[in-house]
Amino acid sequence: MDSGGGSLGLHTPDSRMAHTMIMQDFVAGMAGTAHIDGDHIVVSVPEAVLVSDVVTDDGITLDHGLAAEVVHGPDIITETDVVTEGVIVPEAVLEADVAIEEDLEEDDGDHILTSELITETVRVPEQVFVADLVTGPNGHLEHVVQDCVSGVDSPTMVSEEVLVTNSDTETVIQAAGGVPGSTVTIKTEDDDDDDVKSTSEDYLMISLDDVGEKLEHMGNTPLKIGSDGSQEDAKEDGFGSEVIKVYIFKAEAEDDVEIGGTEIVTESEYTSGHSVAGVLDQSRMQREKMVYMAVKDSSQEEDDIRDERRVSRRYEDCQASGNTLDSALESRSSTAAQYLQICDGINTNKVLKQKAKKRRRGETRQWQTAVIIGPDGQPLTVYPCHICTKKFKSRGFLKRHMKNHPDHLMRKKYQCTDCDFTTNKKVSFHNHLESHKLINKVDKTHEFTEYTRRYREASPLSSNKLILRDKEPKMHKCKYCDYETAEQGLLNRHLLAVHSKNFPHVCVECGKGFRHPSELKKHMRTHTGEKPYQCQYCIFRCADQSNLKTHIKSKHGNNLPYKCEHCPQAFGDERELQRHLDLFQGHKTHQCPHCDHKSTNSSDLKRHIISVHTKDFPHKCEVCDKGFHRPSELKKHSDIHKGRKIHQCRHCDFKTSDPFILSGHILSVHTKDQPLKCKRCKRGFRQQNELKKHMKTHTGRKIYQCEYCEYSTTDASGFKRHVISIHTKDYPHRCEFCKKGFRRPSEKNQHIMRHHKEALM
């Protein structure tokens, strides 16, 4: 057999001579492209073949005696300039063993949807493809390839593949009632709309009963159309056929209304120009195509199948995506199912698998549904909008509709229950709640405050509320004003933004500022690890004198029940006493000659003897007669009286006896990031207020110098507050209830409202 060619075999019940004559006439008319090989005619074609006008001597057309075994060509070739009878074998027939041709008479389309047009049934062992050539109203060709699947006693024909070559005209498709298990595929192509691009989605609605359809789903998700038609209704139309009107139309992407419609028309209604007005809104459906399908049920003679189909219902699942439609007509019967698929392209199975995976991933999200009673009195599943209570038949339309509620989409995660404040940040929400707490701080009497967070929806249709109640967080208070917050970072930010001008002494290690040099010196001990204060009763050491006093009061007070037998130490807990005894017995080897006290080294023992027994400080100051244990302590103390500046700044003439003060001086005066310079002395400053304060020293204004330290200022009130709060502790404003002193009347009033509120009532 030639490449690209095919072989046709003739099998007729007539005589051998008639066959030979017909074969010779046919070969002569093929102009050298065919020859006789035994009982077969071999036809060679390059790509495709169009077989027509095969007649006998009596002028009778041979419509099913011609068999095509192998024909190579494209999927489907449509030619409008050739005769209207013939067969174009599509790609689906190439794998078939036997093919049968049927030729229909040329007609104008008025008698196509009649009961007289019946597809013949052929009994074959496995599978038969029947190709029909149908002429449309405007002369266009529609090719129907029908498939008969064996498996029952009387096989019937179902439509296998349909090509609609023109969407401007109504296309008539004749299909036989299908046997369960067969597949119908419809392909539509628009030749006139190649240059038109549309972003709309295609939707298919098919009615398969005589009482109207119930549309349950639409959009990007499968839709179902229920049908309760019985076989008895089909018998009323002659051969049991009925006309199905199929609407294929374009819907705009932003349309979220209930769309679609189905209608059943009889043959007389179709020939008389049945109107579909009222079913679809023409103003909204820009592109509409109608396909009339004549469906014949040839299985009405089979009682067992008819009884089964009476109780079965058929459903259609339609998946719309872009300009490609994938739909399936599915039967609930456990033994049979009929599918109607509208697809575009060869790789249909791959597309369906990909869409099924996407649909499964999308179905993990839960959507609220509702069941209502439809116009036909049947229950209908809808998707309601929880904002405006509109109902939609698909999740896709509901998603598009939700875009009409931008306010809902822009809602914040956290919302204050006392005002209209909203935010997406938890920290901002807590800070906002703290502002309410500070305002109502005086009236607050309960111990805990409930922090209520706005409900977060589990889905756009959920109304579950989530409320969190937390305990009151630890508050960080500013020691210079009434500001307090639950975040340490916010407190540091507040100190830098509000009180940075009051911190001239800055730590060179961490950058923390202090008002006075003594505070900076105390702070620097946290970096150096120096602990100059040691307990006289134990080995406890600390960097702050106040901490030492607290330690002595709590650990070595007169009222402590547990006292050491070897030393005057007392403890408030028996375990601490036992720990002290273990340490005393195991490590203290230096015994005091005056008591049972033992020390770990000689210096501690000497300090014990001086402070407890002799009260003698061998190293005394010549100026103030203050005693010290070590000569180094006395030397450091003597520098205060002499006023000698031993630490000099390498950038200027500044001198000080304290190295920490020198560090603060260098950081605040000689750092590189000081854009503001004094025009007189060229001294640099980081902030404008510091430069302004410094300029007052050049104007001849009075400078207030502290007699206790190096603090100086031009502000009389600030100087007074400094002397009182740091040195004299002589506060002019004292509380009437606890005698606590304050620098300002406002501080005293705030103290009374906080601690003595009950006394005022």
Curated annotation (Swiss-Prot):
> Could you mention a single GO BP entry for this protein?
regulation of gene expression
Pfam families linked to this entry: zf-C2H2, Zfx_Zfy_act
Where is this gene product found? Nucleus
Give the start-end ranges of region Required for transcriptional activation: 515-761
Record keywords: Disease variant, DNA-binding, Intellectual disability, Isopeptide bond, Metal-binding, Nucleus, Repeat, Transcription, Transcription regulation, Ubl conjugation, Zinc, Zinc-finger
Q: Which GO terms describe its molecular function?
A: DNA-binding transcription factor activity, RNA polymerase II-specific; RNA polymerase II cis-regulatory region sequence-specific DNA binding; sequence-specific DNA binding; zinc ion binding
Q: Does the keyword Cell wall biogenesis/degradation apply?
A: no
Protein's name in the database: Zinc finger protein 711
- What is the originating organism of this protein? Homo sapiens (Human)
